[in-house]
UniProtKB/Swiss-Prot annotation:
Region (Disordered): 210-232
Any single GO CC term annotated in Swiss-Prot or TrEMBL for this entry: nucleus
Record gene name: MED17
Protein name: Mediator of RNA polymerase II transcription subunit 17
Annotated family: Belongs to the Mediator complex subunit 17 family.
Species in which this protein is naturally found: Drosophila melanogaster
Alphabetized GO MF terms: DNA-binding transcription factor binding; transcription coregulator activity
Length: 642
């Protein structure tokens, strides 16, 4: 055929190409051997699918086939009687032989290995891994170097730039203060209206962009309008892209000074401002931060003073409060006044006195907390219960009817204390507590026998404190001790004795001193009675309120009459408060040594009535304390009797 075309035919590549050389030669992977083919086929078998269900299905199918064979052979007669037995034995022998072969193969492992075979992994050259890792590391290094270069450039630009970015500063300002845009101006608010304040003074300030000029006059005017002298009088100098303009009435430094005076003598002083006591102020970002902090502090002090002045005028006190200019005067106790002053200065004077170190942090915290409560009540009104009820009454007053509240309870619900009343109450309590401490410390120092131990409760309220007083004698603690609890209130004291008696004292310190001295008298008598019983002496009589003798300047005299075990000695003890503890001891002897019969008293038995009492020089008796001396005295009289 002249039109025939030559066609090149290539056989299909049955083997995989393992490698291609640089000259184009192809290296094929040799075909797998029989053992490798068998291993691959065995690896493809999923032995987990050969479950009991498959075996049961095969048994059912075999049983069905056997039933069909039986039906077919029922019509044929058996050629040989033992044909069925022979077939059963043959099948059993076949199964046993197969089982024996499987066991032998699995045991010897010469013909078949049951261990799983892993496929051969592709051979990778180490140099390829090295090159790939090197390339990945170089890419990561390039990313890090580019990021570091960008940071370096940004840092150098920020260092070379004298004026910070306006938008960044504005973002920081918005994170700390409330701002809004009115037309083309940016207005901020320093007031506490969002917290519930109703103070009328405006706290708005304006934010503008600082002029980028090198003129010193412009810079000085910008600094004067956007910076305020601190507590230490140093001017804040820093470059900023913002200029904060605050009202003239909010510029400067303000604080509230609280002084308590007694006869023109300062007893306690506290300075209150929004940023804490002293010149330590938390450093914030930007000059505007301190400017706004000082301005808000001025607004806070003026609002607090205005609230206190309004309450001082409205309150009806026994001694009216006086409000003169920036000063409020209130009477705490007789000859003790509370003076609250508002100090506001726009310039720093080096001749001003240094701040007083006696700062009352409790009073400062109370003023902050009380003003916060006023703001909270202004913004948080109780919801009506039920919803159709009028606004205003609290939930307790709503439930007063169903709960059958009495008139006194209803009056208590309507009572509320103002900030000034609570501050006056706290100040009165502070003075009562200091007076009580002074009286107890003075008595503990002056009275050596017995010992007076005071335990002040650490958990107290702002208007009430608690102190427990233990009166004990050294060495005789087990015999007896006298305890009493004193509740220190605003203008009074409440004393609870061990026997349950409750006494209410006024603010005079002399009343508390007299009470402690009377408790010392009763303690000495009660401990003496217990000691006498331990030494087998008889207590004939005792009294804490002796009604004979001269009238004591304070309290009552206490006495005790003791008799020896043989009733031949008697001891009379008298303790008075004049104004210190005065102890007198008398001794009488029975029978009387100076008894002589007379016509009126002829019998001698009347000599056992006892003689006259003779006073003992008690200070000359050996002993460290009153009970120790009495113990020695009773012991000596008992031994003389024996």
């Amino acid at each position: 055929m002249s039109n025939s075309v030559n066609i090149s035919v290539e056989t299909t590549c049955e083997n995989q190409i393992r490698e291609i050389g640089y000259d184009g030669t192809e290296l094929y992977q040799p075909p797998p051997t029989l053992s490798e083919s068998l291993a691959k086929c065995a690896a493809r078998i999923d032995f987990s699918k050969t479950s009991l269900d498959d075996l049961k299905k095969e048994e059912k199918s075999a049983a069905a086939a056997a039933d069909e064979d039986k039906d077919a052979t029922q019509f044929q007669e058996s050629l040989w009687p033992w044909d069925a037995v022979r077939n059963k034995l043959k099948d059993a022998l076949t199964e046993i032989c197969v089982l024996s072969d499987v066991i032998s193969i699995a045991k010897d492992k010469r013909y078949l290995v049951l261990d799983p075979l892993l496929e051969e992994a592709d051979d990778t050259k180490p140099i390829v891994q090295v090159y790939s890792r090197k390339k990945a590391i170089s890419q990561a290094a390039q990313v890090l170097l580019s990021g570091a270069e960008r940071l370096r450039n940004a840092h150098s630009e920020q260092r070379n730039r004298n004026v910070s970015d306006f938008h960044i500063e504005l973002l920081r300002l918005r994170q700390n203060w409330r701002l809004k845009k009115v037309s083309n101006a940016i207005i901020g608010d320093l007031s506490y209206r969002t917290a519930g304040s109703k103070f009328g003074m405006s706290g708005t300030f304006e934010v503008t962009k600082a002029e980028e000029t090198g003129d010193e006059d412009t810079a000085s005017s910008s600094n004067s309008s956007s910076s305020v002298s601190g507590n230490n009088g140093m001017q804040l100098k820093a470059s900023s892209a913002l200029r904060v303009i605050v009202p003239a009435e909010l510029q400067g430094v303000a604080y509230i000074k609280v002084i308590t005076q007694k006869d023109q003598e300062d007893l306690c002083t506290a300075q209150l401002n929004l940023m804490g006591h002293g010149p330590n102020i938390t450093a914030q970002v930007g000059v505007w931060q301190k400017t706004l902090e000082f301005a808000q502090n001025v607004l806070f002090c003026k609002e607090l003073f205005a609230q206190l002045a309004r309450e001082a005028i409205q309150l009806q006190a026994p001694i009216p409060h006086v409000v003169i200019g920036n000063q409020i005067r209130a009477t705490l106790l007789p000859n003790i006044q509370l003076i609250i002053s508002l100090c506001h200065s726009t310039t720093f004077d080096s001749s001003q006195p240094a701040p007083i170190n006696d700062h009352d942090h409790v009073l400062e915290h109370s003023l902050h907390q009380l003003l916060r409560e006023v703001h909270y009540k202004n913004s948080h009104h109780p919801f009506p219960h039920p919803a159709s009820a009028p606004l205003g009454p609290t939930k307790k007053r709503m439930l007063a009817g169903p709960m059958a509240a009495d008139r006194e309870t209803l009056l208590d619900m309507t009572k509320s204390q103002t900030i000034l009343e609570q501050i006056i109450a706290q100040a009165q309590h502070i003075f009562m507590r200091k007076r009580t401490q002074y009286v107890l410390d003075t008595l503990a120092r002056d009275v050596k026998d017995p010992q007076i131990v005071s335990h002040w409760n650490a958990m107290n309220s702002p208007t009430m404190s608690c102190v427990k007083i233990n009166i004990v004698t050294h060495g005789y603690d087990a015999i007896g001790r006298t305890s009493l609890v004193i509740h220190v209130k605003e203008r009074s004291l409440k004393c609870i004795c061990r026997d349950g008696r409750v006494m209410r004292l006024s603010y005079e310190p002399q009343e508390l001193r007299d009470l402690i001295l009377c408790q010392i008298n009763s303690h000495q008598i009660s401990c003496l009675i217990s000691l006498a019983r331990c030494m087998s002496w008889t207590v004939l009589s005792n009294s804490n309120h002796l009604g004979i003798g001269k009238v004591e300047p304070l309290g009552n005299a206490s006495s005790c009459l003791l008799a020896s075990p043989n009733s031949d000695r008697m001891i009379a003890v008298q303790i008075r408060c004049d104004p210190q503890i005065d102890v007198k001891v008398y001794i009488a002897r029975s029978p009387r040594q100076d008894f002589f019969p007379s016509p009126l008293v002829p019998e001698k038995l009347w000599e056992n009535l006892g003689g006259t009492f003779k006073e003992v020089r008690f200070d000359k008796i050996e002993g460290k304390s009153f009970l120790n001396k009495m113990e020695f005295l009773m012991a000596s009289l008992t031994s003389n009797t024996a």
